Amino acid sequence: MLVSTFLALFVLLFALGYVFLIKPIFSEDQEAADAPVRTEEPSAETNPMEGTDIPEEVLTPEPEEEPFDEFDIHVMMVGDDLLHMGLVNQGIQADGSRNYDFLFKDILDFVDAADIAIINQESPIGGNDRGFSGYPAFNSPTEAADAIAKAGFDVVLTATNHTYDQGLGGLKYFHDYFYKYPQISVVGTHSNLNEDSRTSHRGSYWLDKYGVSPNDRPRFDDLQLEPEDMVNTSAFVIREVNGVKIAILNYTYSHNWTTWANGLDGYLNRLCYYDPATREIDFDTINPEVLDDIKLAREVCDIVIVCPHWGYEYSFEPCAYQKDFARQMIDAGADVIIGAHPHIVEPVEYITTDNGNSGLCYYSLGNFIHCQVPNYTSFEGMAWVSIHVDKDGAKVDLDNSGALPLVEYQTWGPLYIQGVYPMEDFTADMAAHHASNFRGGGGMNLDLLHQWDSNLFGEYSLTKEDILGTASQTP
């Protein structure tokens, strides 16, 4: 009985506790349901994200990088434009005027396909009033320069061993004549004219702006030059293609003297060092200004091309100083070296220096146009440099760079220059009628041409299709 009483009392107390514990919960829920909905923004106290620094990349996703449209730039160069008197006379027309468009008629497709076309103007153009002359002291007609412009060349190299053939006055005339063609850059020489920014400067420009000439060393070296003038004091021009800056430099080993002429400093770009006391040229030592120019070009340009007039005439092999200078120039920052002067082709070589720099070197392209006798002087080369541009920058495309073998077709009776042809267009019949067969030049045949091509250009030998096919695909 007592147990039953306690059990009943426990059940009663449990029931009362349940009612008191549960009711407030249900009452609060009901009050919440009956309360109006709050529409104001939550305060900082109720919003734990308020005032929190959230990384921007979480809030705003980075836009996707736009794809870079890769493209190619093509640079071509031919060798010595050397107008002997036979060529000068061949350009005389029936009415007595002169025209030299025929010099380039067979390579116009390649000039057109190139973004930058370069020619080495071996014989100076010192002014028609001086009269015309061939070897040993050349002076070529101004109409030859007109033909260069009409053909579409962009850059004319003027630093050669014949540049000083007509003295300083002839050199200045040679340089200045091309100012009538603003699309052409001249590199290798300088004049006293106030030259514009498309070429290098020497002369009165500096006297007017800074009160000192580049010839007045070391005072000129101590100047604090503006950046564009640092470029303009050097021996290079800059050609820009689709935003890519390409520097072109040109120097000559000498002007056919063993000493450097008085008064010539600053007017003709010198490749070799000379003793300031005796002015004797040291042909085995590079002019340190050349390396300084290349280093500056490397800083301000994407691609650096150096065109030295160097080496020994009629040698198929580069001499010791060519090999030494080439490595020094590549060490300084040259991407490409394209040489001239020997009048015959020398090998193409890819050079890697001890410091890891590398560059493509054409030791000599040989002649382009001339009246020389030996058969090997008529085997020539056209450099074709392909530059690939991607989002990481510009670099030489070795797979699509090389040399197109050319042949100057001379006939005899009297001597007549028919033109300069790609070797693949030069036929056995043309070889049989080549002037070297009749004037003691050793004769000409296709086997000989192919042998030279294999030995000198080798893996870098190109065909017309290699060049024109690739160039036609470039946007």
Q: What are these regions, as identified by a protein language model?
A:
Residues 30-36:
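Juxtamembrane extracytosolic/periplasmic "stalk" immediately C-terminal to the first targeting helix
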Residues 3-28, 41, 47-475:
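Acidic, metal/ion-coordinating pockets
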